């Protein structure tokens, strides 16, 4: 069977198309790709911030994310996606005060994307004037609907407070100030009838920071009392990755 006659312009047309395709791909710089991915993300209603949700919805998202994390089934995330959009501002769904322990990262523990959490970290997850101001900023200017104090199992700062309390441990530098802030929680835990002293002290420390947040920061207090925000406490279990609300 004879072959069909070839169009002499066929190869040149293919070459031209290939050149155009190559140029189009080359034009997709990381910034262009990032913009495209950001544009593909769902957006809230016009005029509404991405975090304009009820405190209960924010908490629901955090706990659902933790369930995924604990089950080792986190969402697939491209941490560069949305970078260009994040240049324009932030709209986190929760502000979290957590311990500085390297084994605890709230973004991973709650399986949240970059920009979703407003995180402050300090050994023992204890409040200070600077941290109170950070939470006031988050609530007043970022519209954050949920504030969480997040302790964790086996907290070294709380354990040091127990040893200082029971064994008169001598600590160097500024550590006595840090441990001194945790001491009231240890004293309260000593009176508890059930559970071990470390676990009880960790939970009590979280509760006390939550109580302080509700009254010590005027902006946060006002928003909490008007039910614009909620303030909760939780403990992260390092062996299992699970977060338990208190």
Predicted regions and their residues:
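N-terminal secretory signal peptides
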Residues: 1-14, 25-27
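Short hydrophobic/aromatic-rich motifs at helix boundaries and adjacent loops
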Residues: 9, 105-108, 182, 192-193
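Twin-arginine (Tat) signal peptide motif
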Residues: 11-18, 34
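Divalent-metal-activated hydrolytic enzyme cores
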Residues: 20-22, 26, 31, 39-89, ...
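Short beta-strand segments
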Residues: 97-99, 121, 148-152, 232-236
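Active-site cofactor/substrate anionic-group-binding motifs, chiefly glycine-
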Residues: 100-125, 130
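Gly/Ser/Thr-rich loops at beta-strand to alpha-helix junctions
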Residues: 102-103, 153-157
């Amino acid at each position: 069977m004879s072959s069909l006659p070839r169009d002499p312009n066929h190869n040149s047309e293919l070459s031209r198309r290939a050149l155009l395709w190559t140029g189009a791909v080359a034009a997709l710089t990381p910034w262009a790709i990032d913009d495209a991915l950001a544009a593909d993300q769902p957006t809230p209603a016009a005029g509404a911030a991405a975090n304009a949700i009820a405190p209960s919805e924010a908490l629901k998202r955090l706990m659902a994310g933790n369930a995924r994390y604990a089950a080792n089934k986190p969402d697939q995330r491209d941490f560069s996606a949305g970078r260009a959009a994040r240049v324009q501002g932030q709209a986190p769904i929760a502000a979290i005060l957590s311990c500085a322990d390297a084994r605890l990262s709230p973004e991973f523990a709650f399986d949240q994307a970059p920009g979703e959490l407003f995180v402050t970290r300090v050994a023992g997850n204890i409040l200070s004037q600077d941290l109170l101001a950070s939470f006031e900023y988050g609530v007043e200017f970022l519209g954050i609907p949920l504030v969480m104090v997040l302790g964790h199992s086996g907290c070294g700062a709380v354990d040091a407070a127990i040893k200082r309390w029971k064994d008169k441990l001598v600590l160097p530098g500024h550590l006595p100030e840090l441990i001194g802030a945790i001491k009231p929680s240890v004293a309260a835990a000593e009176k508890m009838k059930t559970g071990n002293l470390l676990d009880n002290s960790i939970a009590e420390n979280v509760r006390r920071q939550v109580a302080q947040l509700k009254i010590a920061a005027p902006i946060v207090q006002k928003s909490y009392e008007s039910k614009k925000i909620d303030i909760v406490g939780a403990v992260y279990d390092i062996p299992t990755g699970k977060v338990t609300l208190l």
